[in-house]
């Protein structure tokens, strides 16, 4: 999970649109924070989650469109590894699939597409541009702001569903 989380975020999977990876990471971390508080698992690490989220907020504030800084692999790898560590410390590793669903889908579909093509010679995703945010920008006509906002809404809805499932 640690490697998968890091790989889905890095290497231009979700860091190609200004603010997308940072916004989705903040939503994911806040979901983990809430779930940690509900499950009462790891109170001490919650401060680290909040600190990381605040640092990302500062980055997003400074780097609002048009971006001034390129996050690069160093930042996106750090976000992926931190999400993986936070989820593992929560002792509910399968929650990762819900709280980071958009990051997984955005980065993971490219891995699925390449794997299907290379190993099984299946061209089922031939007309899909990966990562997904590039597909909706180029074929759907979405602007960068629309991509960030709509992907964030999708992740918030999925995260709220995960929180609700834990509460019942």
Locate predicted features.
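Short glycine- and acidic-residue-rich catalytic loops of nucleotidyl-transferase/cyclase enzymes
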Residues: 1-4
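Alpha-helical transmembrane segments
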Residues: 6, 10-13, 17-168
């Amino acid at each position: 999970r640690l490697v998968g989380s890091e790989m889905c975020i890095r290497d231009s999977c979700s860091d190609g649109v200004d603010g997308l990876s940072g916004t989705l990471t903040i939503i994911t971390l806040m979901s983990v924070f809430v779930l940690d508080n509900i499950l009462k698992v790891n109170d001490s690490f919650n401060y680290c989650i909040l600190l990381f989220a605040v640092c990302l907020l500062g980055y997003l504030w400074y780097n609002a469109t048009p971006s001034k800084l390129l996050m690069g692999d160093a930042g996106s790898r750090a976000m992926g590894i931190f999400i993986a560590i936070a989820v593992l410390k929560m002792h509910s590793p399968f929650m990762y699939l819900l709280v980071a669903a958009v990051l997984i889908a955005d980065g993971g579909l490219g891995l699925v597409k390449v794997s299907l093509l290379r190993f099984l010679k299946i061209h089922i995703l031939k007309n899909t541009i990966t990562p997904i945010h590039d597909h909706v920008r180029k074929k759907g006509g979405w602007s960068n702001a629309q991509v960030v906002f709509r992907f964030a809404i999708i992740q918030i809805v999925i995260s709220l569903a995960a929180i609700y499932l834990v509460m019942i």
